[in-house]
């Protein structure tokens, strides 16, 4: 085979190989270091499942634990009573309470502030997992909190 023809065949093989890899599921290209969020939730909570789908879509790997004693999970994570919601997650040493948007979690992991975690208290309409078709989203704060229970506004939506 001539040198120019050999180069053409090699280029064609490279294109076919690249195209075949591109057909794989997006998960095949997810970085190995994508953060794992461990989510503790009630087995019957539907909005928690929607929030899990939201953070998965944002690229997080999610480990879901259905538990019946959420009070103990929240206490162990250091979530103050005033900041509590329906589910509690742990990611890279931080507690994430309630329907916190994925981009705020990403910001938390990038900035790495000296706090115990962040929370969206209650279940505000329009927060991830709490969307209601035809209803305007509520304004809400994402709070930061420390191990002593002190809270502050981390960001607002």
Describe the role of every protein-language-model region:
Residues 52-72:
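Conserved helix-turn-beta segment immediately C-terminal to the redox Cys motif
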Residues 1-4:
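N-terminal secretory signal peptides that target proteins for export/translocation
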Residues 31-52, 58:
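Local sequence-structure signature of Cys/Sec-based thiol-disulfide redox active-site neighborhoods
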């Amino acid at each position: 085979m001539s040198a120019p023809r050999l180069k053409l065949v090699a280029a064609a093989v490279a294109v076919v190989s690249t195209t075949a890899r591109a057909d794989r599921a997006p998960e095949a290209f997810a970085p190995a270091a994508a953060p794992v969020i461990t989510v503790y939730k009630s087995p019957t909570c539907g909005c928690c499942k929607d929030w899990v789908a939201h953070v998965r879509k944002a690229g997080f790997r999610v480990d879901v634990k259905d538990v019946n004693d959420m009070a103990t999970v929240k206490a162990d994570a250091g979530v103050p009573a005033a900041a509590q919601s329906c589910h509690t997650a742990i990611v890279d040493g931080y507690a994430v309470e309630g329907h916190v948007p994925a981009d705020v979690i990403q910001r938390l992991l990038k900035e790495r502030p000296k706090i115990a975690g962040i929370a969206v208290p209650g279940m505000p309409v329009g927060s991830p997992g709490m969307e209601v078709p035809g209803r305007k989203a509520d304004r809400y704060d994402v709070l930061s909190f420390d191990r002593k229970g002190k809270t502050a506004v981390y960001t607002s939506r």
